[in-house]
Amino acid sequence: MLIVALATVRTRWAAFAGTFAALALGVSVIAMMTLVLAAASGGNVHQRPERFAAVPSVIQADPNLQVRDRYGSADSVPLLAQPDVPASVIARLPGAIPDRSFYAQVQGVSAAQPALGHGWSSAAFAPYVLTSGHAPSSDNEIVVAGSATVGSRVPVVTAGGSRTYTIAGTVHPRTGEQPIFFTDVEAARLSPGVDALVTYDAATADRAAALPGVHLQVLTGADRHEADPGAVQDTTELTGLTTFLGVAALISAFVAVTVTATAFGLSVAQRRRDLALLRTIGATPKQVMRMVCADAALVGAGGSAAGCLLGLAGAPQLASWIVRQGLAPSWFRVHFTTGSVLALVVAFLAGVAVAVLSVLVAAVRAGTIRPTDALREAAVEPKRIGPFRLLGGLVALFCGVAALAAVALIFPSAATDQKTEAEIVILLIVGTALLSPFLLRLLTRPFGRGTAGMLLRASILTGARRAAAAIVPVLITAGLAASILGASDTANAAASAGEHQQAAGADFVVLPAGTPGLTAALVDRIHSISGVEATAVTDTNMLVFQPPITSLHLEAPIPIPFSAIGIDHLSAALNLKVTAGSLTGLDDQTIAVDSSWDKHVGDTMRLWQPDGTPVSLKVIAVVASSGLSGPSLIVDLHNAGAPMPARVYAKTDSGASAAALLAAVRSQHARVVPISGWSAAVSDQQAKQNQVGLELLLGIAIAYSAIGIASTFLMSTGGRRSELALLHMTGAIRRQIVWIVAAESLVLTLIGIVLSAVVSGLVLGALYVALTGEIGSVSIILPW
């Protein structure tokens, strides 16, 4: 039968062209996603060190929190900020050179790269070489990178405020940062914490690695990049990208597998006469099954190989697009490693497996059916759908609807999780696709009026499986787009509305302009304005051992991050509805939680600041939940771990105080925005960021589905040559035949859109119920 399979593929290559193209494109999608996912999972191993390129060893505090989980096993949790090197370690390593990195920027000069200040002794680590002038010799002198006039005086902005310095010299710029070098004494004043220690002595590095009671990492070789500015942020971005690509790969694989399986199933259905003839002339069931599976394996191997080559070519382009959209660090690239080879092998095997499994059920049926029944089914397609298809469709629909009900009524917080959305939509689409031959009888009734309509409906129902194969790509394309985009837009709008409830009492918000935050001097100036009540706010995350509750009412075994805001003090500008206790006494020893936590006033919570500093805080207040993306914890600015507040909410009592606020902020690297304008701007920015991600998530999948639609319709039409020829022989003219084919394609497309609208309606309806229960009235936003 292998010889027969080879001959079949060779002589009927045109019949297999559609399935080959569908499989090649499907495997290319899977290969691209897995290659980029493998590159993101590999972290920054391919990035060369920049700031510490000229030193052999860099000593840092461990960027992971070392804990024991609830089962007593050692575990580590990535920290949200790089911790400082403990003072005790510095004292025990006298030969190591301290390195400090902190925000510092020449006023009025935009920073294309991170603007950072260092002590002059750190310049040799890169190395930075003087191109003019001399090293800073007093605390009011600096050295800058690039072109500048030596001897000129410039204002420099740091977290504390602005101060004028004299440019003593310049150095040649390097990639990765825009540095300003101070004297070591001035750098220590501006940033007391030590970010890293540098040693040229191997013995000192070994001693640091063996120090008891502390968790340090000694970086050498390519690992020195982990100490570069922004390395923690790069790791965070790659972690988020890995999570996101996992969801994207899930959806892309689903689309590829479904469209490919549909194409292969249709190709087998179009060969019913061949298979019936083989059974009639004496071919055994096993021989027929082997032949069909061999056909699929041959086409699958060729299509998978072509798809892997396309994936190899497309993965670097996809990675470049991800970088341009700001979803990954600027240096992120696809490097071909052992992980890449494994990704290609997985994509290839997945393609062959999909091809064989897609025809397996049809092959079993074709092989086991009696010859006389095979001839009858070859002439007229059976009207009933198979029991396995019926059972699979019902189970998938039941699971999808049950999951929607659970999200809407029991776990509304899961409504905004993209992975949950994708899984539910996939279940509903799979169930609807499997039951589509049965649903066709109901949905084609409106088209059965009149002679032409009756002929059209009869043509569709006679080839119900063929028609269902044409519906599936339409269902996937429209269903995914409407469900996931609509759910995302709706959730973003609802979450944004909830987030801005905290600023409902403010008239204005002060935002940084060209700086990473607001300086302490500016915040103090705003607080000193008569008639202005203000609260400085920064967004952060705190690691907490015990989450409020999981979907199964279990405690998480390790600390996980929870959103929080840090505030400097309470004012009328901050709108937090207190349901128990009071926020008046909020300080560095206390905390407030929202109502989702099972905590009461007087309880003590064990937390970790973003840099891993452990704190035990007393709950002094419980506040109402402020929405799906609002903070669940409220702490003071010290515990927030951010040196510069992100914004200041300000409430003015008169036009004069508003004018004073504007005057105070002028020329202070900040801007004043009316609260309504700020809410809209932030909402638009959040929507844009989410939209970029969803374009990546759905763009490839929808494009592939569109190709699948064209391929399936071409295969369906090509398999009806004898039927169309019979119509022509009975008197139908060419225009009438074209009208019948076009009308049938249009009707099937409309049915696919209707089914996708039902799926989207179920998803968005459940989302509406979930969001209404969480934050009140919401509006469903459709993606058009």
Task: Please provide the spans of the model-predicted regions.
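Membrane transport/envelope proteins' first extracytoplasmic loop
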Residues: 2-257, 266-269, 291, 501-502, ...
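Alpha-helical transmembrane segments
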Residues: 3-6, 10-11, 15-16, 20, ...
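Interfacial "coupling" helices/loops that link adjacent transmembrane helices in transporter permeases
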Residues: 8, 12-15, 256-300, 369, ...
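Alpha-helical transmembrane segments, especially those used as permease/efflux helices
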Residues: 14-22, 240-243, 256, 342, ...
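Short conserved beta-strand and strand-loop elements enriched in small hydrophobics
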Residues: 150-164, 601-617
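Conserved transmembrane alpha-helices of multi-pass membrane proteins
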Residues: 241-244, 326-358, 380-396, 693, ...
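Short helix-loop junctions at transmembrane helix boundaries
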Residues: 308-342, 405-420, 755-784
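Juxtamembrane segments of multi-pass membrane proteins
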Residues: 426, 435-595, 603-604
